[in-house]
Swiss-Prot record:
Assembly and interaction partners: Identified in the spliceosome B complex. Component of the U4/U6-U5 tri-snRNP complex. Part of the small subunit (SSU) processome, composed of more than 70 proteins and the RNA chaperone small nucleolar RNA (snoRNA) U3.
GO process annotations (BP): mRNA splicing, via spliceosome; ribosomal small subunit biogenesis
Keywords recorded for this protein, A-Z: mRNA processing, mRNA splicing, Nucleus, Ribonucleoprotein, RNA-binding, Spliceosome
Species assigned in the record: Xenopus tropicalis (Western clawed frog)
Protein name (record): NHP2-like protein 1
Region (Important for U4 snRNA-binding): 96-128
Residues the record marks as site: Interaction with U4 snRNA and U4atac snRNA: 61, 86
Length: 128
């Protein structure tokens, strides 16, 4: 069984190890109320300047519905990354539906800060 072909526009795509780490952090962020689910809410966090980083699903159909986010991220200097599955992203966000984009938000005194910073660096390495 081969993995389905991923749209080349979904760049940078996280590998299996980074995806697992990302989804774990997304799950923790949901518990700490530091998560915004959905493309529209992710856009709002970017515009308000409260996004730590953005995670998008590479299998969003059509992909163009989330491709405004990387442009906005680059304007705001926010790291962004794609994971393969919207189903997995939805589960990590703690909802029963697929999620095509989510934003981990800034929170003062958050216990997730060290993990968030190390993931931001990993994502930025992908973008180079």
């Amino acid at each position: 069984m081969t993995e389905p072909e991923v749209n080349p526009k979904a760049y940078p795509l996280a590998d299996a190890q980074l995806t697992k780490t990302l989804l774990d952090l997304v799950q923790q962020a949901a518990n700490y109320k530091q998560l915004r689910k959905g493309a529209n809410e992710a856009t709002k966090t970017l515009n308000r300047g409260i996004a730590e980083f953005i995670v998008m699903a590479a299998d969003a159909e059509p992909l163009e519905i989330i491709l405004h986010l990387p442009l906005l991220c680059e304007d705001k200097n926010v790291p962004y990354v794609f994971v393969r599955s919207k189903q997995a992203l939805g589960r990590a966000c703690g909802v029963s539906r697929p999620v095509i984009a989510c934003a981990v938000t800034i929170k003062e005194g958050s216990q997730l800060k060290p993990q968030i910073q190390s993931l931001q660096q990993s994502i930025e390495r992908l973008l180079v």
